[in-house]
From Swiss-Prot:
<dbReference type="InterPro" id="IPR015898">
    <property type="entry name" value="G-protein_gamma-like_dom"/>
</dbReference>
<comment type="function">
    <text>Guanine nucleotide-binding proteins (G proteins) are involved as a modulator or transducer in various transmembrane signaling systems. The beta and gamma chains are required for the GTPase activity, for replacement of GDP by GTP, and for G protein-effector interaction.</text>
</comment>
<dbReference type="GO" id="GO:0003924">
    <property type="term" value="F:GTPase activity"/>
</dbReference>
<dbReference type="InterPro" id="IPR001770">
    <property type="entry name" value="Gprotein-gamma"/>
</dbReference>
<keyword id="KW-0488">Methylation</keyword>
<dbReference type="GO" id="GO:0005834">
    <property type="term" value="C:heterotrimeric G-protein complex"/>
</dbReference>
<dbReference type="GO" id="GO:0005886">
    <property type="term" value="C:plasma membrane"/>
</dbReference>
<dbReference type="InterPro" id="IPR036284">
    <property type="entry name" value="GGL_sf"/>
</dbReference>
<feature type="region of interest" description="Disordered">
    <location>
        <begin position="51"/>
        <end position="73"/>
    </location>
</feature>
<dbReference type="GO" id="GO:0007186">
    <property type="term" value="P:G protein-coupled receptor signaling pathway"/>
</dbReference>
<comment type="subunit">
    <text>G proteins are composed of 3 units, alpha, beta and gamma. Interacts with beta-1 and beta-3, but not with beta-2.</text>
</comment>
<keyword id="KW-0636">Prenylation</keyword>
<feature type="propeptide" description="Removed in mature form">
    <location>
        <begin position="71"/>
        <end position="73"/>
    </location>
</feature>
<keyword id="KW-0449">Lipoprotein</keyword>
<feature type="modified residue" description="Cysteine methyl ester">
    <location>
        <position position="70"/>
    </location>
</feature>
<dbReference type="Pfam" id="PF00631">
    <property type="entry name" value="G-gamma"/>
</dbReference>
<keyword id="KW-0807">Transducer</keyword>
């Protein structure tokens, strides 16, 4: 099946698609950014102690740590 290119559609079809998308979006529940950002901040702060990117990975559990060295003589 060929890919759908919006620019190849007639104007009427483009407008139908836009109206359909807007009908979907109008049903979405929206929240204030100030409230959502506070919730996200709290979520991150509560879990930062468990985050390996913040806390780091213990040496004994680091799968990327070199196991040993190789000497070629």
């Amino acid at each position: 099946m060929p890919a759908l290119h919006i620019e190849d559609l007639p104007e009427k079809e483009k407008l139908k698609m836009e109206v359909e998308q807007l009908r979907k979006e109008v049903k979405l529940q929206r929240q204030q950014v100030s409230k959502c950002s506070e919730e996200i901040k709290n979520y991150i702060e509560e879990r930062s102690g468990e985050d390996p990117l913040v806390k780091g990975i213990p040496e004994d559990k680091n799968p990327f740590k070199e196991k040993g060295s190789c000497v070629i003589s």
